[in-house]
């Protein structure tokens, strides 16, 4: 029995030696293996970049859908409760504030306020500062024929096309703030000539307006009975568009 045991022991040592040799040879990099690794890395980067692009497009479409949903028409509410409750509900859902005639400001987090009982009380002021309101969402505010104060400052989706619809509020609107809206240009401000009842207009800090000082002069001529708030036009005429300091003062901000 000693011979078979010795033979098995010798065979085991030879097998392990071959295994170690094979393992040591596998550690040597060949040109073919390097090229394969490069192809694998390039494929990974290509697939990963495609995934990132797809993810960005998905998130963009999701954001667009969210804004569209937030600006949907409140037709059923309007049919049941009328334009005042519809406009108020829309703004409160957006995170803004509303003021009915003879009442205090109502904000989203206020408790103890039921706007359903104010169905026949006109809305006289709306603060939609920073809200996601767009062209479609304005349809919920335009029926507010007694609206006197409207703040749309820092609204990221408000553009020139939106301003072209504000003529429907010309009969009552007296104060309007467009300060800090990034998509409003001179073309949109030209649409405000319909608002002859305006007494105060804030057009400060509009980055899409290339010549703020000159634009303010033209708006003042267009609305002679309105106080137009904006940059110091004398300074803006001397400075280039890239050298103008931002105007952070806004009397309507609170």
UniProtKB/Swiss-Prot annotation:
Q: Which GO terms describe its biological process?
A: mitochondrial respiratory chain complex I assembly; SCF-dependent proteasomal ubiquitin-dependent protein catabolic process
Its localization reads:
Mitochondrion
Q: Could you tell me the keywords of this UniProt record?
A: Mitochondrion, Phosphoprotein
SUPFAM superfamilies assigned: RNI-like
Q: Which residues carry this modification: Phosphoserine?
A: 250
- Gene Ontology annotations for the cellular component aspect, listed alphabetically: mitochondrion; SCF ubiquitin ligase complex
Family statement drawn from the similarity comment of this UniProt entry: Belongs to the ATP synthase subunit s family.
Q: Could you describe the subunit structure of this protein?
A: Interacts with incompletely assembled mitochondrial NADH:ubiquinone oxidoreductase complex (complex I).
Functional description taken from the UniProt entry: Required for the assembly of the mitochondrial NADH:ubiquinone oxidoreductase complex (complex I). Involved in the assembly of the distal region of complex I.
Q: What is this protein called?
A: Distal membrane-arm assembly complex protein 2
Source organism (scientific name): Rattus norvegicus (Rat)
Q: What is the lineage of its organism?
A: Eukaryota, Metazoa, Chordata, Craniata, Vertebrata
What gene codes for this chain?
A: Dmac2
């Amino acid at each position: 029995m000693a011979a078979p045991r010795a033979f098995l022991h010798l065979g085991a040592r030879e097998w392990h030696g071959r295994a170690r040799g094979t393992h040591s040879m596998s550690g040597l990099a060949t040109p073919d293996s390097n090229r394969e690794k490069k192809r694998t890395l390039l494929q990974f980067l290509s697939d990963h970049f495609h995934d990132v692009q797809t993810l960005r497009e998905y998130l963009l479409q999701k954001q667009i859908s969210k804004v569209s949903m937030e600006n949907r028409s409140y037709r059923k509410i309007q049919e049941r409760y009328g334009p005042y409750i519809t406009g108020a509900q829309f703004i409160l859902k957006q995170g803004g504030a509303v003021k009915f005639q003879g009442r205090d400001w109502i904000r989203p987090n206020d408790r103890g306020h039921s706007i359903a009982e104010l169905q026949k009380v006109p809305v006289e002021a709306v603060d939609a500062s920073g809200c996601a309101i767009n062209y479609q969402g304005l349809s919920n505010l335009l029926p507010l024929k007694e609206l006197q104060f409207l703040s749309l400052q820092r609204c990221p989706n408000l553009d020139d096309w939106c301003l072209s619809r504000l003529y429907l509020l010309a009969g009552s609107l007296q104060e309007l703030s467009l300060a800090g809206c990034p998509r409003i240009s001179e073309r949109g401000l030209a649409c405000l000539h319909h608002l002859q009842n305006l007494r105060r207009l804030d057009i400060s800090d509009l980055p899409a307006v290339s010549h703020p000082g000159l634009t303010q002069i033209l708006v003042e001529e267009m609305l002679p009975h309105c106080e137009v708030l904006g940059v110091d036009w004398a300074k803006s005429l001397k400075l280039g568009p890239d050298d103008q300091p931002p105007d952070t003062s806004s009397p309507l901000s609170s």
